[in-house]
């Protein structure tokens, strides 16, 4: 399928005599045996003009992402409905190596020419920063010491790449991340949102959430969730609200069919098998529903995980202790729904997404209320 995108681009470049390279994630993915669906192409020439011409030639859509940097995107949907992206940008710096040194991580700082990427020559990337060596060693390393400061959204990408490729940040990378953390506040909310959704889609998601907390990222992105730490609850709860929340996310991930085991699954209640058995006859219909996109590249499964993550954020503000020592959170679901909506608005989620999550948080106590009713009192309408 990349040929349907890159061969027309190759012809455009041949016609215009501009030089270009495929760089970044597509090169990395090809090296580890993955078939990419997005391609970064660096051009020594007018990248926006080429992007517009490519979109016209293949029947795709063209967007300007950064006019000053000559950064454009082409989006194309295959006959099977799969979405592909080609990002074209003008080369920064006087050489290919200088351009690579301005990128985020060494694993994304490898490039090949279009002929090699399309199979017309040996696939031997230009790799001056030893990104392939880091990929094989499981290291996540910055291209430059100030890479996080240059673009703080890379802080979230670091967590995502660790989870997606089984990497670990080097000590120097972690130190640089800590120093750059305050810069997350100046990142456009839409960019934070996109990284958060991508993290939610990589199982086991709780591992990434714990990593975000350890690194101090969670309070910067979802302070309402970070504030759940240490908020105690009465029996039958055995964890504080924060740990309860993470285990709810893990349970939701299993409910959604994740095949990558999460350590939190070992503490699921005995009746969990009954729940899964009850769902089995309708499994295909459930999956079809979960995979529906509520917004571009945002399937409903991501919103279900997000709702699980936010479902109890109203508890700290509603916590009371009865004379007998019992802890209560009256109307926490209503308060939590309002706060969840505010947080998602701040992150520029769509109105449809906000409504779905808000409804789930507001009504998350209903199944419990129905379950504890005597059988004869359960009514359906």
List each language-model region with its residue ranges.
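Catalytic cores of the polymerase beta-like nucleotidyltransferase superfamily
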Residues: 1-381
């Amino acid at each position: 399928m990349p040929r349907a995108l890159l061969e027309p681009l190759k012809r455009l470049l041949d016609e215009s005599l501009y030089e270009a390279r495929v760089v970044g994630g597509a090169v990395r993915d090809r090296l580890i045996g993955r078939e990419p669906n997005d391609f970064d192409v660096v051009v020594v020439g007018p990248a926006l003009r080429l992007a517009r011409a490519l979109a016209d030639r293949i029947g795709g859509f063209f967007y300007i992402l950064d006019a000053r940097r000559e950064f454009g995107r082409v989006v194309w949907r295959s006959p099977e409905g799969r979405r592909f992206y080609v990002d074209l940008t003008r080369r920064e710096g006087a050489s290919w190596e200088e351009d690579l040194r301005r990128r985020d991580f060494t694993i994304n700082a490898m490039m090949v020419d279009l002929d090699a990427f399309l199979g017309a020559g040996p696939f031997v990337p230009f790799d001056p920063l030893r990104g392939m060596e880091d990929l094989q060693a499981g290291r996540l390393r910055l291209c430059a010491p100030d890479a996080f400061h240059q673009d703080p959204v890379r802080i979230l990408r670091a967590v995502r790449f660790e989870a997606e490729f089984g990497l670990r940040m080097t000590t120097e990378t972690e130190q640089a991340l800590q120093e750059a953390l305050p810069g997350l506040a100046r990142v456009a909310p839409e960019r934070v949102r996109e990284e958060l959704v991508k993290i939610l889609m990589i199982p086991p998601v709780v591992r990434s959430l714990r990593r975000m907390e350890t690194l101090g990222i969670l309070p910067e992105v979802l302070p309402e969730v970070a504030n759940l730490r240490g908020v105690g609850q009465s029996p039958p709860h055995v964890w504080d609200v924060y740990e309860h929340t993470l285990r709810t996310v893990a349970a939701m991930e299993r409910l959604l069919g994740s095949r990558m085991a999460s350590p939190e699954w070992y503490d699921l209640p005995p009746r969990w098998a009954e729940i899964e058995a009850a769902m089995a006859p309708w499994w295909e219909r459930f999956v079809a529903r979960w995979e529906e996109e509520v917004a571009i590249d945002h399937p409903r499964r991501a919103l279900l995980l997000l709702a699980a993550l936010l479902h109890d954020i109203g508890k700290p503000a509603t916590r009371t202790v009865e004379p007998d020592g019992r802890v209560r959170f009256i109307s926490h679901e209503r308060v939590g729904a309002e706060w969840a909506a505010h947080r998602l608005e701040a992150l520029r989620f769509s109105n449809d997404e906000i409504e779905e999550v808000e409804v789930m948080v507001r009504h998350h106590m209903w199944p419990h209320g129905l379950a504890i009713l005597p059988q004869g009192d359960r009514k359906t309408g």
